């Protein structure tokens, strides 16, 4: 998935695992292509000493493409930064298992790096609003709780996946099932069917609202729920 028109992206390296290099991708509007009003509002905030910024984290089987969110915040004079987490969207490399992770706390590397970039570009006085969707909401609050990151002063969660759907009994009964599947290896595919409602409701070709850059995957790379990933969610 390439960079969107009018945007810039940067890739950071996070190390490697058994599937190769691990990277994350940061995306933002190109400051030189912002509308004049947005640039003026940025300057006004800076002169008043009110430096604000937004960090955006996507959800499962997702990446950043929602231009309207960036354009809304930028129209107010507030810089907007998004991240494609490791093995999602622009950060997925050949041979990698899409979205796979065994410990959600590992995403702290991406979050810390993006926070540091925001502070470096916007100054030490910047106050950051963290906006996160679905699984990104869960990963984000784990980061906030464990690290108490500086400069992040507020959080807004969109449909956060903070707990499993269903009641407590569902978790009690399903936990041994997840553990049993993990005996076959963390990347064992879980027998969970995705009806595809989410994909259809966002894609303009199937009645949704957005015309976005698709990230085609061959069958071995499809976004199947894996036992190791599910265990990370349960933990």
Where in this protein do the model-derived segments appear?
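Short, surface-exposed "cap/lid" segments of acyl-processing enzymes
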Residues: 29-86, 92-94
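Alpha/beta-hydrolase-fold enzymes
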Residues: 133-135, 139-227
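Catalytic nucleophile-loop/oxyanion-hole region of alpha/beta-hydrolase
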Residues: 60-61, 66, 89-126
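Short, well-ordered alpha-helices that flank and scaffold nucleotide-derived cofactor binding pockets
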Residues: 71, 75, 120, 145-146
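N-terminal cap/lid segment of alpha/beta-hydrolase-fold proteins
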Residues: 1-47
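Active-site nucleophile elbow and catalytic-triad environment of alpha/beta-hydrolase enzymes
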Residues: 36-37, 221-235
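Residues at the starts of beta-strands that form the adenosine-phosphate
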Residues: 79, 126-127, 151-154
